[in-house]
């Protein structure tokens, strides 16, 4: 009976740590889940950022890319040392989306409410590319 109980506890701990290793190494794609909706005149981007405050999140335009960065500040981190399992993300996240060179940061509107970053990006008029021809001899 006692031996069986010890084996069950050992199996529980092994499963717990195996699950932790698997989740921490392979589940990063669950971070910053994003939905992008297209409407007639704009795009709506919704990004999950649970646990982040407004001052933790930065949105920028870099060479045609919309860049979203989030970093948990030290104020948000729990300082308890006896965690059995810790799944809430702490640290730095960065994600980028290519928009093109015609966008201005001033045109993009955003808000962060209840762990959701919501961005509104107005569409730019697509100009047909001018064709250039080589003169043949």
Curated annotation (Swiss-Prot):
> Is Chaperone tagged as a keyword?
yes
| Keywords for the protein's UniProt record, in alphabetical order | Chaperone
Which residue numbers delimit the sHSP domain?
A: 25-137
Protein's UniProt keywords contain Membrane = no
Briefly, what is this protein's role? Probable chaperone.
* Family under the similarity heading: Belongs to the small heat shock protein (HSP20) family.
What name appears for this protein in its UniProt entry? Probable Hsp20 family chaperone
Annotated organism of origin: Onion yellows phytoplasma (strain OY-M)
């Amino acid at each position: 009976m006692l031996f069986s109980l010890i084996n069950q506890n050992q199996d529980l701990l092994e499963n717990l740590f195996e699950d932790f290793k698997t989740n921490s190494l392979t589940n990063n794609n669950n971070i910053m889940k994003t939905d992008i909706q297209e409407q007639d005149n704009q795009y709506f981007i919704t990004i999950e950022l649970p646990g982040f405050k407004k001052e933790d999140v930065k949105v920028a335009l870099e060479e045609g890319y919309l860049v979203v960065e989030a970093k948990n500040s030290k104020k948000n981190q729990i300082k308890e040392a006896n965690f059995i399992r810790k799944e809430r993300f702490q640290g730095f996240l960065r994600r980028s989306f290519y928009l093109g060179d015609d966008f201005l940061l001033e045109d993009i509107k955003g808000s962060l409410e209840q762990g959701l970053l919501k961005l509104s990006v107005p569409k730019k008029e697509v100009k047909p590319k001018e064709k250039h021809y080589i003169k043949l001899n």
